[in-house]
Amino acid sequence: MTGIRAIFYYFLVDLLTLLCWAQGKGGQHFGSTVVVSDVNLSNHGDQGSSEPPQTAEGCRGYFDVMGQWDPPFNCSSGEFLYCCGTCGFRYCCKFKQARLDQNTCTNYDRPVWLQPGKTPPKIDDPSHDPTRDKTNLIVYIICGVVAVMVLVGIFTKLGLEKAHRPQRENMSRALADVMRQQSHCATEHTERDPNLVIHVQHYETMPSRSSANNLHSSKINNVVPTSPHLPQMAHPHSYPTMGQISNPYEQQPPGKELNKYASLKAVAEKGNDDFYSKRRHLAELAAKGSLPLHPVRVDQERSYSPEGGTLKVNGQKAKANKIHTHPLASTYNPDYKTWDHSEHSLRRQAYATKKHCPVESVNEPLQSQNQHFMPSQPYFVTNSKTEVTV
């Protein structure tokens, strides 16, 4: 029984000894046993290999990513004793395991792209395939679509112009043919009817405001000269420029138009002056009461009408003399002809037919001219103050 207790105490003492050694507590008595702590269990040779103290480490100078030179510096402030970071950005730290191996960096020399006159060598990237790069494909597609649209618009415009061009040419040709037929018809009608006067006016050369002389001259040119006091100007061959109507597509020189207008104006003013001077002379004789009963013979001026027209007039006047049985009718001279409203209407009809003259009117017989001539009323001269013209 006593042996068992001794063994139990022995194990208990050993256990307590181990606990005290672990906690570093010495000098404690457990009963009769003294436990000694801080026992050096190592050999005597291991006592000389103690770790030396850490020294400060410096970072070397380098070129950063912007090409600027960063000077070297030392890590000697407190606990920050190690050079840490990357090759392009370095700093001091206190963890040894994060220290940077500066021997692996290559940015200690000046970069090539900073040296003037030298281009950096092209580094082929094996991961980059230019055949698979489609970033510029969108630009090419947009430019191609715009170019195609522009070409389509241009060709469409050209096609429309070409489609409308034959119609315009046909219209211009048809208009030219119609104008040419009208001018030819007007010329033929004028040559057939010598008692009609064509009054040609060029509106481009006429002034904006017409004077009194121009108005009188235009009225006289439109009147058929049936009286011997007014010279006849109906002959189309006296003034060749009046009988021909110019082509509207041909631009005449302004000098010829001015000469034509001046000649027509001079002839009209001369006829107007002669007519009114002779009429004033007859009015003065009628006022004085000294008009003779026999007709006054006035020398006829040179007539511009053809001889055929005067013969027809004389023949018609002879018929008129046979019809009238008035005593004074024997004194009537067939050469004297007064104004008649029927002739004015006939002239208006002639001008109307000239504007709408068909092609068949050129082949009409010449006997239709006799329809334009009607016997006119004679002019009787008396001494009465209330003289009336019939």
UniProtKB/Swiss-Prot annotation:
- Membrane protein topology class: Single-pass type I membrane protein
Main localization of the protein described in the UniProt heading: membrane
What are the recorded Gene Ontology BP terms? regulation of short-term neuronal synaptic plasticity
Signal found in the keyword field? yes
Entry's transmembrane regions:
135-155
Q: Where in the cell is it found?
A: Cell projection, Dendritic spine membrane; Synapse
Q: Which residues form a coiled coil?
A: none
Signal peptide (residue range): 1-22
Kindly report every residue range on the membrane side named Extracellular: 23-134
Similarity remark: Belongs to the shisa family. SHISA9 subfamily.
Name of the protein in question: Protein shisa-9
Q: Which gene encodes it?
A: shisa9
